[in-house]
Amino acid sequence: MYLNCMVREVITNQEGKANAISYINKEDRKEYQLKGNIIILAASACSTARILLNSKSSIHDAGLGNSSGVVGKYLHDSTGSSQGAFVPDLMNRKIYNEDGVGGMHVYTPWWLDNSKLDFPRGYHIEVWGGLGMPSYGFGFGPNNLNKYLGEEIGGYGDSLRDDVKRFYGSVIGISGRGECIAREDNYCELDPDVVDEWGIPVLRVNYTWSDHERLQAKHMHETFDEIFDAMGAKTTWGRPEGDADYGLQAPGRIIHEVGTTRMGNDPKRSVTNKFQQLHDAKNVFIVDGGPFVSQADKNPTWTIMALSWRTSDFIIDQLKKQNI
């Protein structure tokens, strides 16, 4: 294992087969090569695409694995939008020596028929509680909740302590995390003018939400409203309208980015085959989120692990057969 290293590119021979990687040692800031019969990339969807695009040669003039022109394209991340509320019925609860539901959440899966809705696919709901450490200050102290009861905001000493006890655990939050539609016009590419501190060209990301995602976020908040109304709750934050994309987080904020080296049977329309093996270089494999053609609304990590396992089995099988 080589630590504190930054991979620049995959090196290929005259036949276009990968035989090494080039990397920068961050400690002495020198460039080295590490040879290998099989190259496995697992740098994450965007960074793996960056390595491939930087791996240009006379045979792979558009970057390694990019004869299709698809490397970097179809980048997509989960959608995300949230809303918070104050629940009067949760006031004055008995306080236990417990962690309760604070930063973690309760997961509610998608259960609706989207053929009856105005957007494709779906989303799940995450409900999280207010049993974290009480805070104090302008805009976020527990005594600010007095305004929802028509009472005076402010206080210190005994009145502040009483407010903390009364309001502790009486706020909740709901987040939606949904499936984004993979589109060719959402992509990352090499920036022709910018390099990092190691002299390696960086990525430039081009990404926008479509009406599919905006309508999904709109439905999220309509659902949140129904839940809060049924609880007798009062929304305290996070109820934007369409001019703010219904509170959609910026692309990349949910950190489920996938899709930049999509798998497929057709080398003209995909980067890898179903075993995450490059169409253009049979001894190069990708085992991160890049090969995803789409992803559902939950974290992709376990699927990445499962596909990596399958790819490992495939590599062993191909080595035994001397195919690679």
Model-based region annotation:
Residues 58, 193, 241-244:
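Active/binding-pocket-proximal capping segment
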Residues 2-3, 8-13, 20, 165-180, ...:
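A glycine-rich dinucleotide-binding beta-alpha-beta segment and adjacent secondary-structure elements
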